[in-house]
């Protein structure tokens, strides 16, 4: 595999990483040759540096790197998360074919379907008003309390599918900063609010601290006996859930083979299901399942997740681009970049290979972004003219949900297309100077000003086009990126499914709490930490 990477680097050097502008000028069919589709979902990667030779090498890289073999190991239930001895089967949660999926010889689909059915019944009862609060009033607000994968997925998807909301209002609390839950509690009434506490172990400090605040909110207003009527849980720690005061009939479980950042398809998606209904949640699963089938069956040259992963690897480990920008031209996808940030960086932000040796080259990039067109008036300046090349990934629906605002959607489309074209084409000195002289500027001044209006161009982007942001389309988009991250992880030769860096932070915070509370000395910590503790303590008084 290393030999192929070196070949890719040599090819990139020989072609100067492909002059994308020249490639379009020389090939009128470049778009059709370097774009692939899955039904209405189109992925255009013609505005990247990929050419025929590079694509052949990337395909060979996937073959020799074991992408297809590792893919089947994942789907078959092998414990590919070897540092925790766990299978990786979030795909089973959206296995709409209901074909058996085995973990340690046991078919998990009956359990998956049982939890999904229980979620559906509970969601319907909340939405219809059958399930009421302690005083007999229907639930009007649902507050999900979780963090990380128990928050980012539900927040992102619930916002993305706002046009499909016909259930109670949805709110989300994640940060241990008391301001977060305090602000949410100002928006809801105890008698008509349901809290969902999402924590597999029911020990996550942030989640349980916020859950206790919510419990006090209910108990103070309605009495201790009311707690059971206003809480549900997504957890496997039944004893701890019971001790908290939540009825076992309102507890929904999931499994060790579901990683937090892949858990939106599980009971963690309960607040989304309550917001949009079980039928739409089912369509969300359908979209992801369609991508799973495509990922398993399509040849590499037509396989969206594999191609996306190969291009991502090429950008990171061949061309050395350190970041990627996620730029959805859809305001309702405003949390999608943050969702992908966790998915990608928590999965592939590793420095050790599966053999326990240091990663050669780079592992995952920094992932960031904002929705268009907002980003155009913020950081696109750097993408266009900065010294770092930042691959951009655009997303745009052909149709919006507001037919009366069609003109605004057309403006949105024109902006995203203009940005991808501008990144590729740029503007030469001669073009910039002519633009200035055409406006009446004298030649000498134009020579001075023109360099500031030059855009180098040749900056890569991928554009995704789809019909409309439906539950099916969203499920498809998320699964596409999940599998992309998997492919890149295989090529980086890392375990994409553990997160020991997250665990380290938890350990250190737990150890520092007694120091912050003034119960223990800070002497065992470094001088910076000691100084910060002292400064904060002084201000707190």
Curated annotation (Swiss-Prot):
Pathway participation: Carbohydrate biosynthesis; gluconeogenesis; Carbohydrate degradation; glycolysis; D-glyceraldehyde 3-phosphate and glycerone phosphate from D-glucose: step 2/4
Database matches in Pfam families: PGI (PF00342)
Gene3D superfamilies, A to Z: 1.10.1390.10, Glucose-6-phosphate isomerase like protein, domain 1
Top-rank taxon: Bacteria
Location (main, coarse): cytoplasm
Cellular component, GO annotation: cytosol
Enzyme Commission number(s) of this protein: 5.3.1.9
Compartments reported by the entry: Cytoplasm
Catalytic residue list: 346, 377, 506
One GO MF term attached to the UniProt entry: glucose-6-phosphate isomerase activity
GO BP annotation list: gluconeogenesis; glucose 6-phosphate metabolic process; glycolytic process
Catalytic activity, as annotated: alpha-D-glucose 6-phosphate = beta-D-fructose 6-phosphate
UniProt xrefs under CDD domains: SIS_PGI_1, SIS_PGI_2
Keyword terms, alphabetized: Cytoplasm, Gluconeogenesis, Glycolysis, Isomerase
NCBIfam families, alphabetized: PRK00179.1
Annotated family: Belongs to the GPI family.
Job description of the protein: Catalyzes the reversible isomerization of glucose-6-phosphate to fructose-6-phosphate.
Name the UniProt record assigns to this protein: Glucose-6-phosphate isomerase
């Amino acid at each position: 595999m290393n030999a192929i990477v070196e070949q890719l680097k040599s090819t990139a050097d020989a072609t100067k990483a492909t002059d994308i502008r020249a490639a379009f000028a020389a090939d009128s069919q470049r778009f059709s040759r370097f774009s692939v589709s899955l039904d209405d979902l189109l992925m255009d990667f013609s505005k990247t540096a990929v050419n025929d030779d590079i694509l052949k090498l990337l395909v060979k890289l996937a073959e020799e790197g074991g992408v297809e073999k590792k893919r089947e190991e994942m789907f078959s239930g092998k414990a590919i998360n070897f540092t925790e001895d766990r299978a990786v089967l979030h795909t089973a949660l959206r296995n709409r074919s209901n074909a058996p999926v085995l973990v340690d010889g046991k078919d998990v689909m009956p359990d998956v379907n049982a939890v999904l059915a229980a979620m559906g019944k509970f969601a319907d009862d909340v939405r219809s008003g059958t399930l009421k609060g302690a005083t007999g009033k229907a639930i009007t607000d649902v507050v999900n309390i979780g963090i990380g994968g128990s928050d980012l997925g539900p927040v992102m998807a619930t916002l993305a599918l706002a046009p499909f909301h016909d259930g109670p209002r949805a709110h989300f609390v994640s940060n241990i900063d008391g301001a977060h839950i305090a602000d949410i509690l100002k928006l809801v009434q105890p008698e008509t609010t349901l809290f969902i506490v999402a924590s597999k172990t029911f020990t996550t400090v942030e989640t349980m601290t916020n859950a206790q605040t919510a419990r006090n909110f209910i108990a103070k207003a309605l009495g201790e006996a009311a707690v059971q009527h206003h809480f549900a849980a997504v957890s496997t720690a039944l004893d701890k859930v019971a001790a908290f005061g939540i009825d076992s009939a309102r507890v929904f479980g999931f499994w060790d083979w579901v990683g937090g950042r892949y858990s939106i398809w599980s009971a963690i998606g309960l607040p989304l299901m309550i917001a949009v209904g079980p039928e739409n949640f089912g369509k969300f699963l359908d979209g992801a399942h369609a991508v799973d089938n495509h990922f398993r069956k399509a040849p590499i040259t037509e396989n969206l997740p594999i191609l996306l992963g190969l291009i991502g690897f090429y950008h990171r480990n061949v061309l050395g681009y350190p970041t990627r920008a996620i730029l959805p031209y859809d305001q309702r996808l405003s949390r999608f970049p943050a969702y992908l940030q966790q998915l990608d960086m928590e999965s592939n932000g590793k420095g050790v290979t599966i053999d326990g040796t240091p990663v050669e080259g780079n592992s995952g990039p920094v992932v960031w972004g904002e929705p268009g067109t907002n980003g155009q008036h913020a950081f696109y300046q750097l993408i266009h003219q900065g010294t770092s090349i930042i691959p951009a990934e655009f997303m745009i629906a052909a149709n919006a949900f507001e037919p009366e605002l069609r003109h605004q959607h057309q403006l949105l489309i024109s902006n995203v297309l203009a940005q991808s074209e501008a990144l590729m084409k740029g503007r030469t000195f001669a073009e910039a100077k002519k633009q200035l002289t055409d406006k009446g500027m004298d030649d000498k001044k134009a020579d001075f000003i023109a360099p500031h209006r030059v855009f180098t161009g040749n900056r890569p982007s991928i554009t995704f086009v789809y019909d409309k942001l439906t539950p099916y389309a969203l499920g498809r988009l998320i699964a596409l990126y999940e599998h992309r991250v998997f492919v890149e992880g295989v090529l980086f030769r890392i375990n994409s499914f553990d997160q020991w860096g997250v665990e380290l932070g938890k350990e250190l915070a737990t150890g520092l709490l007694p120091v912050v509370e003034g119960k223990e000395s800070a002497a065992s910590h470094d001088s910076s930490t000691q100084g910060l503790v002292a400064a904060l303590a002084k201000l707190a008084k």
